[in-house]
Amino acid sequence: MIAAPFDAVWQSVIQTFFDRNIPVRTLEKASGLVESDELHGEIGRDCDCGSYLGIPIGGYGGAYGGDAYYRFRVLVESRGSETALTLRTTCRGRHEGVVGDLVCTLAPAREEEVRSSIRDRATAPR
């Protein structure tokens, strides 16, 4: 929960996406939904795709490099004088030695950067 009205949180989501060059795919203020287009990153830096035989896949000394693709989905809901913010992410990885996509998770730090930016903007004194 964020101790700010819906409109302040909504504007914070829009401003955060703009400042971080996150392209918007869906923008529906009536339902409180914002979804990004797919962003390109790096396995190991932006997404965790697990390990193979105990060796991390990609990044930070991993044996396999690769591309990561991820999205943000944000739901903003009014709860009286406060606003609920739900942030969900999807992430997949690709590597030339693997058939199909790897199922990955977005790096917690990357998700927290977006969440805290929205929260800090919404609660900043005006």
Task: Name these PLM-found stretches.
Residues M1-R126:
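Ser/Thr-rich, low-complexity intrinsically disordered terminal regions
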